[in-house]
């Protein structure tokens, strides 16, 4: 086995190989091993990202353009500038030390700041984390709700709802998103580039990106961004500006988006992710019929 640590961007052929590796692992495990953010960064240049590639033997051969084909790629790990990390090993190469080697290299590059995500919390993830004395530092719940009757949203007085307009609402949305998620290490740090990445994805639909606007001031008060891929919809992100929190706007926005996914898009189920510390949001979602389908955990060194 050969390990190779490279900064962004990955060669296109290698990025394709990483995406295919993640697909094979997801097919085997029933859960995606890499987050949307990581997969978006695989084939784009984000300064500070480190990619660790594990090959069966030497790195892949070169194609006609001089880029590695990565045909023998058996493992991959990503380390972001904030210390957030993920790794995946192809199913056929597990229990052979590949995951251990990948994690050891991640620790060599950022032990003091490492935060390793394990999606679905599979048994192998707990074993690997324990081997390096990593403990659970954070939990992220994956919830699902089958199609069922919903209450109507009760809007606070003076709130209008409209669709997001790309190129017009970008800056205002980024500002409110940052304020709404000031204590959230990933969502609150979104940049113009992060937003642009999503706006150019095949799944993006502005008609499913709802903005709540103050009818008197025109200020953006909150939003509900929905996402549809396949036959499931997702409460992608709901945010409320702190000055409008406590008014019931968050619940109204949530219901508005759920009605859209269920009745306008006709989807049989809706999913969402919620941080384990956000007990208020979890309680709201449970009252609306969501139940836990999976659990993601983040491991960190015990001293962090």
Swiss-Prot record:
PROSITE patterns documented for this protein: GNAT
Subunit structure comment from the entry: Monomer.
Record's protein name: Mycothiol acetyltransferase
SUPFAM superfamilies membership: Acyl-CoA N-acyltransferases (Nat)
EC number: 2.3.1.189
Entry-linked HAMAP family: MshD (MF_01698)
Gene behind the chain: mshD
Role summary: Catalyzes the transfer of acetyl from acetyl-CoA to desacetylmycothiol (Cys-GlcN-Ins) to form mycothiol.
Chemical reaction(s) catalysed: 1D-myo-inositol 2-(L-cysteinylamino)-2-deoxy-alpha-D-glucopyranoside + acetyl-CoA = mycothiol + CoA + H(+)
Domain (N-acetyltransferase): residue spans on this chain: 8-162, 159-304
InterPro entries the UniProt entry points to: Acyl_CoA_acyltransferase, GNAT_dom, MshD_Acetyltransferase, Mycothiol_AcTrfase
Keyword Membrane belongs to the record: no
Organism: Kribbella flavida (strain DSM 17836 / JCM 10339 / NBRC 14399)
Annotated acetyl-CoA 2 binding sites: 238-240, 245-251
GO molecular function: mycothiol synthase activity; protein-N-terminal-alanine acetyltransferase activity
Source species, domain of life: Bacteria
Binding site for acetyl-CoA 1: 87-89, 95-100
Amino-acid positions noted as binding 1D-myo-inositol 2-(L-cysteinylamino)-2-deoxy-alpha-D-glucopyranoside in the UniProt annotation, renumbered to this chain: 36, 186, 227, 234, 273
Family recorded in the similarity comment: Belongs to the acetyltransferase family. MshD subfamily.
GO biological process: mycothiol biosynthetic process
Keywords: Acyltransferase, Repeat, Transferase
